[in-house]
Amino acid sequence: MAHMDFPFYTPKDAFPVGGAVRDLLLGRRPTDLDYAALDPEKAAEEAKRRLGGSLFPLDPKRGHYRLVVGERTLDFTPLEGRLEEDLLRRDYRVNALLWKGGAVFGLKGVEEDLRRRLLVPVREENLYQDHLRSLRGVRLAATLGFGLPRRTREALGRHARFLQAHPEALPARERVKEELARLLLSPRAAFGLRLLERVGLLGVYLPELALLVGLHQGGVHHLPAWEHTLSAVFHLLWLWPEAPLEARLAALFHDVGKPLTRRFDPEVGRFRFLGHAEVGAEIARASLFWLRFPKEVVERVAGLVRRHMDRLPEERKALRRFFLRRQDLLPDLVYLMAADRLATRGVEREAWEVLGRYEEVLKDPLPQRPLLSGEEVMALLGLQEGPEVGRALKALLEAQAEGRVGTKEEARAFLLYWRGGREAQASGTPDHPH
């Protein structure tokens, strides 16, 4: 194959392999480096002396070591047998590459795979040596923009059916989470999710979402539920290419509650999904916790799913109050609501209204904190520490967002007025106007 200089530090008796070599041949800059070494531990220690970073064993019995230097990861594994034998143990031909002495070595057919941008397993049985490899194949297709020829799709499908029948063979959930996150963070996330479903892996790793496949919706929905979900993911990234993982997960899970809430309403003559956002939030929370996503990610996604059906009020003060109460979910919620509408026939105009009205609110930024502290509120209203202080601060912040309060003096006057209304309600007198 090609002759080239490897542009990264390489320890003695270690050879760059796999994705880093592939990426260089594709004109991409590798983020992580893999090395096959005669003595992986020795090579990893040599790299640490040269580069610094943190070294730790991944699997010392098998000779797997990892060095983390800044944002780059260097993995060291044993060079097993002769060169060709080592390459034959790898997952896909485009990953069965090794750099040695200024030359790149690969298996027969890899040059055509790279030229045609196709993903082909080295051998189908290799998928069963590490059961994450089928999911990794879908992720690679999405991140690299590679196609899956029929033989690959069929091999992945057989492996998916094996995993369905043998759940004990499933990879560690942390590894599954990493592959799914990398797939979703790809610009081609919707394409990758479609492949995941087509080869049968959606039901293996995300069975809650597999229930959306073929689910008829009707009404304004011209697409079945799964196709609508893919369209929402696509439109989210079209509107917001740098969308964070939480927003992408929310787009993926936003309608996951529909299969459990689908009911035919004879009054309107179609199916309805009342409460699907609330049900979906709990399903998303359970699914993502099972996959070992961090708690802060899970809670944000659940909040976005729960709120994605909220309607924007017409009146300006109410609109600012609406966004203030959901400030912790912004801007993700706005883009999710817009993407959901763009994936639905007949309400596309609402997507631009959502974005436009949010942009209008941003011209006068929402307040980040109340003008008075908790201690000042307690002193002013004669309160002890407790939930009433929090309610007072919340009311003050909303008044600031609405434009009714702009100074500390106005804040004090507002809170005294607010307390009068609370006392009037408690005593049973007519409701205070505020």
Curated annotation (Swiss-Prot):
SUPFAM superfamilies: Nucleotidyltransferase, Poly A polymerase C-terminal region-like. Gene3D superfamilies: Beta Polymerase, domain 2, cca-adding enzyme, domain 2. The keyword Disulfide bond does not apply. It catalyses: a tRNA precursor + 2 CTP = a tRNA with a 3' CC end + 2 diphosphate. One of its GO terms (biological process) is tRNA processing. It comes from the Bacteria. Pfam families: HD (PF01966), PolyA_pol (PF01743), PolyA_pol_RNAbd (PF12627). Coiled coil: none annotated. Its cofactor is Mg(2+). CTP binds at residues 19-22, 90-91, 95, 130-139, 175. InterPro entries: HD/PDEase_dom, HD_domain, HDIG_dom, NT_sf, PolA_pol_head_dom, PolyA_RNA-bd, tRNA_CCA-adding_enzyme. Its EC number is 2.7.7.-. Mg(2+) binds at residues 32, 34. GO terms for molecular function: CC tRNA cytidylyltransferase activity; metal ion binding; nucleotide binding; tRNA binding. Keywords: Magnesium, Metal-binding, Nucleotide-binding, Nucleotidyltransferase, RNA-binding, Transferase, tRNA processing, tRNA-binding. It is an enzyme of class 2 (transferase). tRNA nucleotidyltransferase involved in the synthesis of the tRNA CCA terminus. Adds the two cytidine residues to tRNA. Belongs to the tRNA nucleotidyltransferase/poly(A) polymerase family. This is CC-adding tRNA nucleotidyltransferase. It comes from Thermus thermophilus (strain ATCC BAA-163 / DSM 7039 / HB27). The lineage of its organism: Bacteria, Thermotogati, Deinococcota, Deinococci, Thermales.
